């Protein structure tokens, strides 16, 4: 075997070893995005919900800033309940359909049905809640503190 071939083989092996250490991506976020688009009939891009208020996006704390942010807190809480049932919401794939009336969850196992129900409820909530541009990309350290933490900061 030529030395160049050995180098290529070594590079492939190292790449595969590195890839095996990467944690799984949140696969069902693609499905959640599709449910959101179905529920709001494509009127607002899903990205607009990824950094909104105190709960829409990664993490969450404090008091939701409005109805839309409450949808996200409820969704986070629902995923927490799914975890208590032994489900892994961010990687649970499920069946759903986008029908003229609204999106609907399809058949599946207990975790698939539960996670789909969480996502469906949130998507429908997003569709009916007003979107306030002032709550996009807010300073969560200032506006999303818990009451106890905020009181400690003022003492």
UniProtKB/Swiss-Prot annotation:
Entry's EC annotation: 3.1.1.4
Tissue: Expressed by the venom gland.
SS bond list: 38-98, 54-144, 56-72, 71-125, 78-118, 87-111, 105-116
PROSITE patterns found in the cross-reference section: PA2_ASP (PS00119), PA2_HIS (PS00118)
A GO molecular-function annotation: calcium-dependent phospholipase A2 activity
Annotated PANTHER family: PHOSPHOLIPASE A2 (PTHR11716:SF100), PHOSPHOLIPASE A2 FAMILY MEMBER (PTHR11716)
The name this protein goes by in its record: Basic phospholipase A2 PC9
Species this protein is from: Laticauda colubrina (Yellow-lipped sea krait)
